Amino acid sequence: MSDNAQLTGLCDRFRGFYPVVIDVETAGFNAKTDALLEIAAITLKMDEQGWLMPDTTLHFHVEPFVGANLQPEALAFNGIDPNDPDRGAVSEYEALHEIFKVVRKGIKASGCNRAIMVAHNANFDHSFMMAAAERASLKRNPFHPFATFDTAALAGLALGQTVLSKACQTAGMDFDSTQAHSALYDTERTAVLFCEIVNRWKRLGGWPLPAAEEV
């Protein structure tokens, strides 16, 4: 058996990166000025046979930072009332501190070197998380500063679809449109979609890579 055929660990699969699925709901499109209102994160794990699956889930409603813009159109779209006391919202610091703590623990346990965000249209989620981490003065950010795995691009390649709901349905997954634009639900669906794309590539023989002499 080649060395490549034995690469079944999470640390081997993504060049030492620890994939963490993220989705955010916000009060606009500008990460510097508009409020982060909700964030969910799902870590991933790999079994002994090299199949990828969801692991730990974290979810927080977030208080708008002082001076944040709250765009009415964005709030109408996601249905979030930032002033609803039943949201149980926490500060950006509290939400990201807890997520980063769990992610750092996962990096260490898996033998990985750094976290990488998995998200649908990842630039949006990445920009808001990074801006919030900067505002919260969180120095030990475990995520890569710019690299991501974007499931919109991956699904376009693997499934011919770039919209999350259509990609999930094409992959044979359920998608409840009434729950869409909840950070928790969208993160759960994105995590399962990413795992399906990675595992489908493995089922098709694309991973582990063949040894050099076999190519």
Swiss-Prot record:
This is Ribonuclease T. InterPro entries: Exonuclease_RNaseT/DNA_pol3, RNase_T, RNaseH-like_sf, RNaseH_sf. Trims short 3' overhangs of a variety of RNA species, leaving a one or two nucleotide 3' overhang. Responsible for the end-turnover of tRNA: specifically removes the terminal AMP residue from uncharged tRNA (tRNA-C-C-A). Also appears to be involved in tRNA biosynthesis. The record marks 29, 77, 124, 146 as: Important for substrate binding and specificity. Its cofactor is Mg(2+). Belongs to the RNase T family. Pfam families: RNase_T. Binds two Mg(2+) per subunit. The active form of the enzyme binds two Mg(2+) ions in its active site. The first Mg(2+) forms only one salt bridge with the protein. The gene is rnt. GO terms for molecular function: 3'-5' exonuclease activity; magnesium ion binding; nucleic acid binding; RNA exonuclease activity, producing 5'-phosphomonoesters. Mg(2+) 2 binds at residues 23, 25, 181, 186. It comes from Escherichia coli O1:K1 / APEC.
